[in-house]
C-alpha cells in the first residue's frame, strides 16, 4: 500500500507522461488533490510531497480546513478550490474563504459570490460548470446558455472568469471520453476569443485523466487515488 506522498509522485508521473505523449509542455496540467472527507492530517501529508492545490466539495468542511491551515500552517500558502454543488445560502462562506470556485452554473450564484467577496481579498477565480452530457442528474449549465452567463460574470467586479469545468458521463471507452472533453475544450476556445483571460479547463479524474489531458485539460481533480477511499459518515 503506497503512502499519500507516493501516490502523489505516481500520479504526477502519469500526468507528465500524458503531457509528453500529446506534445504538451511540462507543468501545463495542475494536480488538484480532492480532499473532501479527509482529515487535516492527510492534507498535511500531501503538502509534504509538495502539493499546494486542494479541492473541497462541502462548504463547512472546506472552510474549517482553510481556517485550520491559515492558523496553524500559514507558511504553506495553500490554494483552495470549491468543486461541489453550491447552494445560494452557502455562497457567503465560499466567497469569504476560497480562492477558486469551479461550479458556477447560474446567475444567482455568480451575483452572490461577487457581492459577498470581501474587498480586502483578490477577485475570486471562477469556472462555469457545463453539462456536456445532457444527464439530468448532473449539475451544470446547458452549452447554449454558456455565453449569456459568461457575459454576466465578465461584468462582475469581484469575480474573474478563468474557464470551464465539467463532469462528463462515466464511460470506459477512450474515444468517447476524448469526444466529451473535446466538446468542452471547443467551448472554452470560443469563449477565449472574447475573454482573453480564459485559460483554464477543469476536467479529468482518475479514470479519464489521459483523455482529458489530450483534449487540453489544465486541472485534473484526483481524490481516492491520492488519499484512499472516502468515509462519507463525516458528512452525514
From Swiss-Prot:
Gene Ontology terms, MF aspect: pyridoxal phosphate binding
GO CC annotations, alphabetized: cytoplasm
Keyword tags: Pyridoxal phosphate
Source taxon at top rank: Bacteria
Role of this protein: Pyridoxal 5'-phosphate (PLP)-binding protein, which is involved in PLP homeostasis.
Similarity comment: family membership: Belongs to the pyridoxal phosphate-binding protein YggS/PROSC family.
NCBIfam families per record: YggS family pyridoxal phosphate-dependent enzyme
This protein's name: Pyridoxal phosphate homeostasis protein
Organism: Vibrio cholerae serotype O1 (strain ATCC 39315 / El Tor Inaba N16961)
Origin organism lineage: Bacteria, Pseudomonadati, Pseudomonadota, Gammaproteobacteria, Vibrionales
Amino acid at each position: 500500500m503506497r503512502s499519500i506522498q507516493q501516490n502523489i509522485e505516481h500520479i504526477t508521473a502519469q500526468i507528465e507522461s500524458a503531457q509528453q505523449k500529446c506534445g504538451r509542455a511540462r507543468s501545463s496540467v495542475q494536480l488538484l488533490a480532492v480532499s473532501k472527507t479527509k482529515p487535516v492530517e492527510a492534507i498535511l501529508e500531501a503538502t509534504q510531497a509538495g502539493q499546494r492545490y486542494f479541492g473541497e466539495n462541502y462548504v463547512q468542511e472546506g472552510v474549517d480546513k482553510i481556517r485550520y491551515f491559515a492558523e496553524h500552517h500559514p507558511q504553506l500558502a495553500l490554494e483552495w478550490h470549491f468543486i461541489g454543488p453550491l447552494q445560494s445560502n452557502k455562497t457567503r462562506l465560499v466567497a469569504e474563504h476560497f480562492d477558486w470556485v469551479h461550479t458556477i452554473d447560474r446567475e444567482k450564484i455568480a451575483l452572490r459570490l461577487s457581492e459577498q467577496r470581501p474587498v480586502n481579498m483578490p477577485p475570486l477565480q471562477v469556472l462555469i460548470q457545463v453539462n456536456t452530457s445532457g444527464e439530468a442528474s448532473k449539475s451544470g449549465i446547458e452549452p447554449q446558455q454558456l455565453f449569456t452567463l459568461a457575459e454576466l460574470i465578465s461584468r462582475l467586479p469581484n469575480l474573474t472568469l478563468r474557464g470551464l469545468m465539467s463532469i462528463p458521463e462515466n464511460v470506459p471507452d477512450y474515444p468517447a471520453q476524448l469526444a466529451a472533453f473535446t466538446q468542452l475544450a471547443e467551448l472554452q476556445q470560443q469563449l477565449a476569443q472574447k475573454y482573453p483571460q480564459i485559460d483554464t479547463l477543469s476536467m479529468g479524474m482518475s479514470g479519464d485523466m489521459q483523455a482529458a489531458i489530450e483534449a487540453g485539460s489544465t486541472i485534473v481533480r484526483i481524490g481516492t487515488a491520492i488519499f484512499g477511499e472516502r468515509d462519507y459518515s463525516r458528512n452525514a
